[in-house]
Amino acid sequence: MVRLPRHPGAVPDLAHEQRWLPRLGPLLPVAVPEPVGRGEPDEDYPWSWSVYRWLTGANPTAGAVSAPRRLAEDLGRFVHALRRVAPQDAPAGYRSGALSERDAPTRAAIAELGGRIDTAAVTALWERALRAPRHEGPPMWSHGDLSPGNVLVDGDRLGAVIDFGCAGVGDPAVDLMPAWNLLPAAARPAFREAAGADDAEWARGRGWALSVALIQLPYYWRTNPPLAENSRHVIAEILGERD
């Protein structure tokens, strides 16, 4: 498989994968992209590009997972295994900082969405997430973008996880996002148990899922219907969990 960046901002992600995937892959319980070559820019194409071994599977759809508990356990084991990788010399993850760093863009997205969502309810949920205790332990690895588009299902099991451009170390709570962007409510406890998330981390993970969905929704409203639909799904799932 060949990955060709469509804009210069994506070029560092491929270099990141070329460096770190050979180290991470052998330590993880499911397949990840295996770089086998790298192309250099020339007069026909302006950026570096990567070649990977082909991975089998298909992207799952939120609300249509055939064996949700099994997938939840597989995803949780992947998250747990990634966290156990030693963080020495690893870069900071793209989404591994404090949740408060996303406060301004999240509130701006809520304002932009206006009457298209229940802005009062999502603001209250966002403020609740900001009150969750911060990560106080050592930095841990996270994938950073565990969305349905970066998960491959083979049969009814997790076959592979792709796109590690956001991966790095810090607070790993962002990797709990599949609980809301993919899994049904009944499968969330199995995912949480397999991942080993405590109450504070679960609250931060919910906050990450909400923030990412709120920011993506107005951005992709007209340009990427599948991502916009998944963002609406996440918001609805989190609203449905209100105490």
Tell me the role of every PLM-derived stretch.
Residues M1-A98, E112:
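ATP-binding pocket architecture of kinase catalytic cores
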Residues V2, P35, W126-L176:
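Active-site acidic catalytic loop and adjacent metal/ATP-binding pocket
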Residues V11, P68-A72, S96-D103, T119-T123, ...:
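Short, structured helix-loop boundary elements
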Residues H16-R19, R23, R77, A124, ...:
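Generic recognition of well-ordered alpha-helical segments
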Residues E17, L21, S48, D103-R107, ...:
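A general structural signal for well-ordered alpha-helical segments in protein cores
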Residues S50, R77-H80, G93-A132:
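Active-site catalytic-loop/activation-segment of kinase and kinase-like phosphoryl-transfer enzymes
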Residues P60, E73, C166-V169, M177-D243:
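Helix-rich C-terminal or lid/interface subdomains of diverse kinases
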